[in-house]
């Protein structure tokens, strides 16, 4: 009897709402999921790692990578890995915010591509959001397509990897609605840039998340120190 081969996808899973939904969509799409998480010296590294592990358990993911890339703290120039720079709490501003980690998603995708090539995966899922987001330049559809081209040019000839961005043109409200529809355990996810016990409620990430729940007419299941 021939063994049925399963198609594999590498899911970049931070433990946040977007990457978690993206991973659930990969499961719905019929992929065997290999999860990748990056510890890059961010303020909420320990809390995000806990969220990642909890979500992997919920998805029954057998194969996962926890990759340490501490050099982001040496580069600095952002409020997530440079503790001398305060995380903004006054609301979303125009332009690229100080919470943007220089070329983070490009580096994440490059490392994930190496894992995909090793594992024989045909797809990589990343939960970037272009429309209703902080405006990071490495979250656009154009950037992802350029990275896909570079990855497929820079890997073995028989390696063909699709980068799937199921949320890129969704609003936060649509993300909340889709997550609820797919029974995503949103109570296990973590989005806050500042805190690890209770979400601050005032950083850009908390504001975007709370706005999404409000616009979707739903209550966020996690606790907040304060509301915007």
UniProtKB/Swiss-Prot annotation:
CDD domains assigned: QueC-like
Enzyme Commission (EC) number: 6.3.4.20
Residues annotated for Zn(2+) binding in this entry: 192, 200, 203, 206
Name of the protein: 7-cyano-7-deazaguanine synthase
Keyword Oxidoreductase assigned: no
Cofactor notes: Binds 1 zinc ion per subunit.
Family the UniProt entry places it in: Belongs to the QueC family.
Cofactor: Zn(2+)
Pathway it works in: Purine metabolism; 7-cyano-7-deazaguanine biosynthesis
UniProt-listed PANTHER family: 7-CYANO-7-DEAZAGUANINE SYNTHASE
